[in-house]
């Protein structure tokens, strides 16, 4: 994919026609306290905050209301998700409920096919995305790095896709770099790495490959200092994006001198 593509410029991140000044999205669960979450949001300045409808509807009235107040205080757009859904209809119903509760057409589509790995249901995900798009949703689908799956999601109308780097919460970083780089080369839509990043260097790496944004939760929330880690990731995302725009040198199999040979003795010119 050429550097001349409009997507590869210093312009802000654009998703479904809306622009965002940040290329980092942040999850809202597992933080030590609400105050720590708010401080992490303030430090990271994310484009969006993800929130689970299931988590809030199951929390009870007072706790749920407290969370809504927290989101409002953060003053960051909310991206509701369908976390915990295992069937196509369950995901669609949850998305429709989230639209009413959060008053937004944005939805992070999660359709889980395996409880152990939390791997997406790749067979039903495109159909779920298609139905939601036809219902007026702006769908950001959580998926694997499989090229055929991601292409199918684009074909049904997804204007961005969210492949994982590794299973959710593992913090391993990109486990299949070749597939992820191939995905970037082949798809001309925004790609947001959704899961599996554990270190700021992981985020920097995928941004250097040309990915458009990253979504983080566990890596920040479970850090010893979540606020400092939020800042580290924000800096890493920006550094990786800047490096991609700058155009990195190509790796070589043999050593190349970094100083000129002009003026050195002729017997050294072999």
Where are the regions a protein language model picked out?
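Divalent-cation
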Residues: 26
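Metallocofactor- and cofactor-centric catalytic cores in central/energy metabolism, strongly enriched
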Residues: 52-54
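Conserved SET/PR-domain catalytic core that frames the SAM/AdoMet-binding pocket
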Residues: 17-23
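Alpha/beta enzyme core
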Residues: 10-15, 29-48, 61-78, 85-270
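Long, charge-rich, low-complexity intrinsically disordered regions
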Residues: 2-7
């Amino acid at each position: 994919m050429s550097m001349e593509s409009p997507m590869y410029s210093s312009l802000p991140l654009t998703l479904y026609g809306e622009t965002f000044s940040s290329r980092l999205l942040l999850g809202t669960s597992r933080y030590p306290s609400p105050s720590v979450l708010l401080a992490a949001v303030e430090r990271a300045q994310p484009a969006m905050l993800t929130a689970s409808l299931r988590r809030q509807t199951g929390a009870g009235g007072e706790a749920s209301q407290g969370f809504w107040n927290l989101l409002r205080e953060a003053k960051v757009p909310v991206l509701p998700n369908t976390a915990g859904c295992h069937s196509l209809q369950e995901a669609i119903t949850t998305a429709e409920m989230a639209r009413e509760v959060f008053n937004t057409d944005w939805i992070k589509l999660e359709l889980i096919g395996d409880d152990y790995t939390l791997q997406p249901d790749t067979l039903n995900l495109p159909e779920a995305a298609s139905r939601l798009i036809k219902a007026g949703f702006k769908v950001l689908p959580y998926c694997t790095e499989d090229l055929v799956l991601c292409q199918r999601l684009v074909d049904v109308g997804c204007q961005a896709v969210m492949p994982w780097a590794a299973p959710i919460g593992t913090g391993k970083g990109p486990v299949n770099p070749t597939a992820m780089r191939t995905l970037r080369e082949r798809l001309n839509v925004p790609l947001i790495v959704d899961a599996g990043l554990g270190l700021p260097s992981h985020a920097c790496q995928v941004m250097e490959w040309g990915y458009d944004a990253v979504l983080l939760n566990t890596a920040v929330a479970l850090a010893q200092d979540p606020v400092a880690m939020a800042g580290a990731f924000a800096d890493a995302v920006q550094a990786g994006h800047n490096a991609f725009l700058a155009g990195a040198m190509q790796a070589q199999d043999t050593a190349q001198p970094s100083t000129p040979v002009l003026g050195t003795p002729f017997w050294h010119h072999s």
